[in-house]
A protein has these predicted regions:
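Short terminal interaction segments
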Residues: 1-13, 95-156
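Extended, charge-rich alpha-helical scaffolding segments
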Residues: 2-97
């Protein structure tokens, strides 16, 4: 073993996994944080649509950066949530299994919150697709204006 070996091993040992209770709290806190983040994302996507309609390039660039940073943070929480669920339940955990670990009242609250989160995710996906479709259409129109039609007549 090299001189760095024992030090590295000690550093790994000091980075213990959270307890089961801490893992559950981290998981629940991550869901709550994502609820707020998806509300923010929805607002940003609405702003992005308006900026695209108005052809506001600078605003689109700023919004793209804000969306990207928000999505990165949400992805980090998703990864952490999966790791916490794996710690609590073992490989291939499901949220239904996580719910089952809780007492009835907190379970009902978490299930409701999870359903709301899923709805926010779906709405943000819908808004993201709408924005993407608009931007692609605008790009296509600009290409036609700048470069003309590739083919005026369709073959019979």
């Amino acid at each position: 073993m090299t001189a760095a070996g024992p030090a590295a091993a000690g550093a790994v040992a000091s980075q213990q996994q959270p307890s089961r209770q801490q893992a559950m709290h981290m998981l629940l806190d991550g869901i709550a944080a994502d609820m707020a983040a998806y509300a923010t994302l929805q607002h940003l996507l609405e702003q992005q649509f308006e900026a695209a309609v108005r052809h506001q390039r600078a605003a689109l660039e700023q919004l793209a950066e804000a969306v990207s940073a928000l999505v990165e943070a949400m992805e980090a929480r998703r990864v952490q949530r999966v790791a916490c669920a794996v710690q609590l339940l073992g490989p291939a955990p499901s949220m239904a299994q996580v719910f089952a670990l809780l007492k009835p009242e907190p379970r009902a609250r978490l299930q409701q919150q999870w359903q709301e989160l899923e709805q926010r995710v779906l709405e943000c996906k819908r808004l993201g697709k709408r924005n993407s479709d608009l931007l692609v259409e605008q790009y296509t129109i600009m290409q036609r204006v700048l470069h003309g039609e590739d083919q005026i007549y369709e073959p019979a």
